[in-house]
């Protein structure tokens, strides 16, 4: 269910949309962290 990504910046918006403050890119997928 992760958004595909190349850089962590691409994960910021989709993660914020999920209520998360931070996202990083691993294995070309976004992993959201610091979620409510």
UniProtKB/Swiss-Prot annotation:
Pfam families for the chain: Toxin_2 (PF00451)
Broad class of where this protein is predominantly found? secreted
Q: What are the UniProt keywords, alphabetically?
A: Disulfide bond, Ion channel impairing toxin, Neurotoxin, Potassium channel impairing toxin, Secreted, Toxin
Which Gene Ontology CC terms are recorded? extracellular region
Q: Which residues form the signal peptide?
A: none
**Cysteines joined through disulfide linkages:** 5-25, 11-30, 15-32, 20-35
Question: What Gene3D superfamilies does the annotation carry?
Answer: Knottin, scorpion toxin-like
Q: Where in the cell is it found?
A: Secreted
| UniProt note on tissues of expression | Expressed by the venom gland.
Q: Which InterPro entries match?
A: Scorpion_toxin-like_sf, Scorpion_toxinS_K_inh
Q: Please give the Gene Ontology molecular function terms for this protein.
A: ion channel inhibitor activity; potassium channel regulator activity; toxin activity
- In which family does this protein belong, per the annotation? Belongs to the short scorpion toxin superfamily. Potassium channel inhibitor family. Alpha-KTx 06 subfamily.
Can you quote the domain comment?
A: Has the structural arrangement of an alpha-helix connected to antiparallel beta-sheets by disulfide bonds (CS-alpha/beta).
| Biological function | Blocks Shaker B channels expressed in Sf9 cells, with a dissociation constant of 52 nM.
Output this protein's name.
Potassium channel toxin alpha-KTx 6.14
| Source organism (scientific name) | Hoffmannihadrurus gertschi (Scorpion)
């Amino acid at each position: 269910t992760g958004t595909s990504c190349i850089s962590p910046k691409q994960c910021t918006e989709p993660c914020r949309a999920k209520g998360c403050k931070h996202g990083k890119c691993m294995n070309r997928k976004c992993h959201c962290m610091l979620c409510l």
